[in-house]
Amino acid sequence: MNNIELSSLSDEELSSLNLDSKIFGVIGVCGIVGNLVARILMDRGFTVIGTDMSKKEDCRFKSSFDGYNIEIYYGSHPEEFFEKIDYIIPPPSLPKTAKVFDIIHEKNIPILNLGDIFKLFAPDKEVICITGTNGKTTSTTLLKHVAYYAGLKPTEHNLKGMQGNNEFIPSLQSRLNGDVAILETGTDGTPGGLNSIITLTKPSSGILTNITPDHLSDDSDLLDYAKVKGELVEGLKGKQLIVNSDDPTIMGLIKELSYVGDLITFGLDEKPAKLGYKPCWCGRKIEIEEIISGVGKYDCSCGIKYEKPDYIATNISLKDKQFTVSGPDGEYTIKMAIEGLHNVYNCLGVIVAAREFLGLSYDIIQEAISTFKGVPGRMEIMGFVDEKTIMVDYAHNPAGVETVLRELKKIYGDFTVVITVSSESGHKGDVEILNDALKYAKFIVPASYSSRKVADEFIEDNPNLTENIVLTDQIPEEFRKRTLGATKEEVYEGIKTGLNTDVNTIVAIGEAAIKFKSVINDFKR
């Protein structure tokens, strides 16, 4: 974002523009930026004409223009397009050497760059940014669900197949029509990314779900990664910040950054599952009585220690999918339609935001949460084959995998896990994932190249593991594209192998399991 020329006009020049009754030409309306910019302008009553080199049938996000009155030229940038417009907005990805700029300059059409759009049209509603390592998508989707249930309309990017935390999406989404902007932010550990979003969206509140190792190489430092998430903390000084105080990394970060503002904490009162350790800000290792990976009760001699949160979930029953939330204004029973302790955390953070940010009553919140069926790809049941349940889950980092597998063990007992992950933490992360799989699953099918490589190493050291690790007939080829760790064929082979194991539940984990989940339909037939 910092390497892109975002603005072409000074603040003084922008303030002097007379945009009344002007027609805006947007290049690249089939792309993310062009699509969102066009809709922002139309939401504010402007006339927009679009153009894109894609054919109409290939325009990926065409359906998001349903309900809008927009003229679009597909397959070219015709002369008449330039004749009709008063201002033109090119996508930031368009090279300045592109021929279209010669036409623009020849016709002397004023250019507005993306940065000019950001300056001209600030968010006109309250904004909340949600970040953390795990739980962002579920928390964002659930808070939107609660808002809709209460009669509020959150802004929606409506870009089919796109997560809302990529590149410019959150910053542009906050400028679309709606009563409130509920934004998933901070998809990776890149410094400056969150800060840019906060600068452009001007949020008044935020949720920090947890901080665990993700998107890290073997040489990376969890605390450096935490500082990236700390950009949200910095940006919300003097404003509202909702945090999971069961996470010592978060509470230490707040202390390190000397946060002052409306800090609201949440956490669980639950029996710990095991002892865990994370690096403390003082340089020591901090021991955690873990409820789920990386969070629980803790006490470091440097002064970072567990304290009872403002909102706490008690009387948790995973069987009945309910818990009691105790907060500043009393105790209330919450019934969930989703499963697992990690989702109790997600629900609790959303409850706090619904109360403190949206100002909703517990009656509305209770009803809304009880009707939320979850996010596709999060412990999602895809169907049944020979009376066996097949599920997929996006878990792709060691902490997320451990949490999901632990909860599956509690809920379903014996199960088989098909691993399609190639950890962004490298070989170390792949080893952690297989160790967790051995701890919680009855059978493990390493379907990705990375998981198969680690499985072969484990079996070489301990041949008895072949009782639990079930290899596919085809050896996975070396493949990785960011967090995508397996091909469609490898996912198919993994699920086929999993169906031959003696359990009633099979779960495929990782981005590839989600991307290629349609292969499960082949087995249903």
Locate the predicted segments by residue:
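ATP-dependent carboxylate-amine ligase
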Residues: 1-57, 70, 88, 109, ...
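Phosphate-binding loop of NTP-binding sites
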Residues: 13-23, 33, 37-44, 62-63, ...
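Short beta-strand "acidic-cap" motif of Rossmann-like dinucleotide-binding folds
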Residues: 47-52, 155-156, 265
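Short, ordered loop/turn segments at secondary-structure junctions
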Residues: 53-54, 77, 116-117, 159-160, ...
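Short loop/edge segments at beta-strand edges and connector loops
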Residues: 74-76, 113-115, 158, 243-245, ...
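Short amphipathic alpha-helix with an adjacent loop that forms part of the alpha/beta core around
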Residues: 77-84, 199, 492-500
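Acidic, Mg2+-coordinating active-site environments of NTP-dependent enzymes
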Residues: 80-85, 90, 96-110, 152, ...
